[in-house]
Curated annotation (Swiss-Prot):
The lineage of its organism: Eukaryota, Metazoa, Chordata, Craniata, Vertebrata. This is CXXC motif containing zinc binding protein. SUPFAM superfamilies: MAL13P1.257-like. The N-terminal and the C-terminal half of the protein have a very similar 3D-structure, suggesting they arose from duplication. Requires a bound zinc ion for normal folding and solubility. Belongs to the UPF0587 family. Keywords: Metal-binding, Zinc. One of its GO terms (molecular function) is zinc ion binding.
Length: 160
């Protein structure tokens, strides 16, 4: 079992507390089999709500799958306690926002999509359903009378 951290980096304009919103947030990942090196050609998603039992009664995971090439059963689990918001003071630096516990799988790519939420840095104005698929997002904070945005989104995986 290996833990991988998803580190996130972005430039935040007048925003803080950027985070995945809700237990149904979809983490879209590309995964590699640790046994044979096969990489999934399609994006796969996992959520905190997903729970699949592991063989042999060893607990559960967010996703269990059998490798198409070598037939090995692999799993990945979201570690709920590792979820952290990306704040204004984190802007333009890499910060771990979630960790995954992997058995036989390695996450190699992440595709941010809809489902993020944030707050206005000065006003606390909530912004929901932020879509980061284009790596940029903008809106307007009526209370502060200023633009808000998320720019230059980057990510990387590191072993914990």
């Amino acid at each position: 079992m290996v833990k991988f951290a998803l580190q996130f980096k972005a430039s935040l304009e007048n925003l803080t507390q950027l985070r995945p919103h809700g237990e149904d947030f979809r983490w879209f990942l590309k995964l590699k089999c640790g046994n044979c090196g096969e990489v999934s050609d399609k994006w796969q998603y996992i959520t905190l709500m997903d729970s699949v039992p592991l063989k042999g009664g060893r607990g559960s995971a967010s996703m269990v799958q059998r490798c198409k090439l070598c037939s090995r059963e692999n799993s990945i689990d979201i570690l709920a306690a590792s979820l952290h918001p990306y704040n204004a003071e984190d802007s333009e630096t890499f910060k771990t926002i979630v960790e995954f516990e992997c058995r036989g799988l390695e996450p190699i790519d992440f595709q941010p999509q809809a489902g993020f939420a944030a707050e206005g840095a000065e006003t606390g104005t909530p912004f929901h359903e932020i879509n980061l698929q284009e790596k940029d997002w903008t809106d307007y904070d009526e209370k502060a009378k200023e633009s808000v945005g998320i720019y230059e989104v980057e990510h990387r995986f590191t072993k914990c």
